Amino acid sequence: SIGSELCRQISKQQPKQLIIVDIYENNAYDIQQELLRKNPSLNLLVLIASVRDSKKVNDIFAKYKPEIVFHAAAHKHVPLMETSPNEAVKNNVSGTLKVADAAGRNGAKRFILISTDKAVNPTNIMGATKRICEMIIQAMDKKYDTDYVAVRFGNVLGSNGSVIPLFRKQIEEGGPVTVTHKDIVRYFMTIPEAVSLVLQAGAYAKGGEIFVLDMGEPVRIYDLAFNMIKLSGLTPNKDIEIKITGLRPGEKLYEERLMEEEGLQKTANEMISIGKPISVDEKYLFEKLQELYVEAYNETEKMKELVHELVPTYKIDKRS
C-alpha cells in the first residue's frame, strides 16, 4: 500500500527513471499498468525479485545505480509474524540489511527506510524486527557515504490487512464486528498523507535520523467500529454486534512514538520531527545479526532471545 502510493507520488515528479522491485508479480503488474495509464511517458522499469536474494539485489543496484532508494518491503502483520517469527527476521532484518548494503556499495545518495511506531518498546516480533532495521540504518550511515534515514509512523487507513477493510467486510456479512479490547487505541493517517510526509522527510535527510510523523490524536478502535456501523445505516449491538475477542499475541493497548532515551527535534514541517538517535555499537550489531540469521534459518527457540539482546525493550509474549 505504502510502496504503491510512493510510486504514484514519485511518478508525478517526472523522475529520470522509476524502478519498482517487488516479489509479488500481481501487485507489480497492477501498479505498472496504473502508472503507465496515467503517465505514458514515464520511464518505468518493474523487476520481480526478493530482498532476501543478495546477489540479485546487488546486481540490480550495480546495473541501474539508483540515487534515491525507498525501502518499504516488510512482513507487517503482527499476529501472523508471532506464529512465523523466523520469517519476520529473514524478510525484515535480513532483507533490509541486503538492500541497504547494496545501496551503499553502489553509491546511492539517499536511503529511506519505512518504519513503524510498533518499533518502539515492541511487544511483538514484527515491531522488534523493525527496530533492528532502524539500528541497521544508523550503522550503515556510518559505513557508507549514502545518507540513511528511517521514517516512523502508525497505521494507515485502508492499507492491505488493516482494520477498516476488515470492519467493512464484517458489516457487509452481517457481523459480528470484532474488536480485541474495548480500550485499544491506534494512530491513523491516510496513505497519501503518510507518503507525502515520507517524501518530505526524505528531503530533510542528512543521515542517521529517525523521522517521526505526527499522527494526530489516537483513535479508539471500538469507537471506529461503532461509527462505521452507524455510517452503514445500522444500529451497533442491535443490527450488528460488536464482539470483544481479547488481545492477540504481541498486541499492545496503545502504540508509542518514542523510546524513553529519544527526544524530539522540530523540522520546518510541524508534522515531521526527528527522534534523537540512540547510539548503536556497529561491531556488536553486525556480530549479533550473523548469530540471529543462523538461528532464524535453523528455526530455533534461541532466535527470540537474540532479538531481545539486540532490542532490550522487546518484551517476548509468552502466548506466541
Regions found by a protein language model. Give the residues of each.
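Strand-loop microenvironment adjacent to phosphate/nucleotide-handling motifs in alpha/beta enzyme folds
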Residues: 135-156, 160-320
